[in-house]
Swiss-Prot record:
The modification N6-acetyllysine is found at K16. Belongs to the globin family. One of its GO terms (biological process) is hydrogen peroxide catabolic process. O2 binds at H58. One of its GO terms (cellular component) is blood microparticle. This is Hemoglobin subunit alpha. Heme b binds at H87. The modification Phosphothreonine is found at T108, T134, T137. Heterotetramer of two alpha chains and two beta chains. The modification N6-succinyllysine is found at K7, K11, K16, K40.
Length: 141
């Protein structure tokens, strides 16, 4: 459960990310593909090379979804319902992949914002991403 302090940390972080969301989302995807090659199987039609337009585009989708979740942190199920349906029923993404991408997002954010990435912010973002992952996998059952 996200505390009021966690929610503030998440919202503050997303404000700092600002216009870099798509860039960070794409970088996190690239990290995931390189670190966990099995995740590539969900993107057989993508050019997965560094800087590809498809990875950039999907990175923007990831960033936009997370920005929406951060803006609606008190109603994650409502904010992410359509994405949960999509990933569970159409794309059939293995739930473990959300944890892998979450880890890569944390690494990316820490690399770009080391001064702001305090232990408290790290913990808040980790809890937020875990909550997002839980909501995204809720319709698998």
């Amino acid at each position: 459960v996200l505390s009021p302090a966690d929610k503030k940390n998440v919202k503050d972080c997303w404000e700092k990310i600002g216009g870099h969301g798509a860039e960070y989302g794409a970088e996190a995807l690239e990290r995931m593909f390189l670190s966990f090659p099995t995740t590539k199987t969900y993107f057989p039609h993508f050019d997965l090379s560094h800087g590809s337009a498809q990875v950039q585009g999907h990175g923007k989708k990831v960033a936009d979804a997370l920005a929406n979740a951060a803006a609606h942190v008190d109603d994650l199920p409502g904010a992410l319902s359509a994405l949960s349906d999509l990933h569970a029923h159409k794309l059939r993404v293995d739930p473990v992949n959300f944890k892998l991408l979450s880890h890569c997002l944390l690494v990316t954010l820490a690399a770009h914002h080391p001064a702001e990435f305090t232990p408290a912010v790290h913990a808040s973002l980790d809890k937020f991403l875990a909550s997002v992952s839980t909501v995204l996998t809720s319709k698998y059952r």
